[in-house]
Amino acid sequence: MTKVMIVDDDRNTVKLLQTLLELDGYDVAVAPRGADVLPVAEQALPDIFLMDYHLADMDGVDVIRELRAHATFAKTPIIMTSGLDVEVEALEAGANVFIVKPFEPGDLPGLFTSLLAAGN
């Protein structure tokens, strides 16, 4: 079962995404703050990260840099989401894909499959 880690501080967004992904057969872990990402990820060992740019305690780009510096997650696919114009910054930090909010949650499984098949 593919493990997805949602990194987002918006409870409603997390609840929606978690419910939809679990219905699609994904195992989901959640980190609501940037500071929670590494401890939760080290326990859950996700196959892919779905991360919001704006978090309560830090921005997602800083979290991406931390993940890329960690041997276990250096190559784990990261999808960053935001309504802000931060695509270049996110990709330069190491995100594999940037999605503009709002996005269609139903498109995520296909994107996950593509990223995991590509070995990114």
Region spans (language model):
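Alpha4 helix (beta4-alpha4-beta5 surface) of REC/receiver domains from two-component response regulators
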Residues: D62, L84-V100, G110
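Short amphipathic alpha-helix used as the core "switch/output" element in two-component signaling
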Residues: P39, V61-T72
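Short hydrophobic/Thr-rich beta-strand motif most characteristic of the beta2 strand and flanking loop
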Residues: G25-P32, V40
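Active-site residues of response regulator receiver
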Residues: D52
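C-terminal output helix
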Residues: F103-S114
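The feature encodes the CheY-like receiver
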Residues: V14, A56
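Charged docking surfaces used in two-component/phosphorelay signaling
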Residues: K15-L23
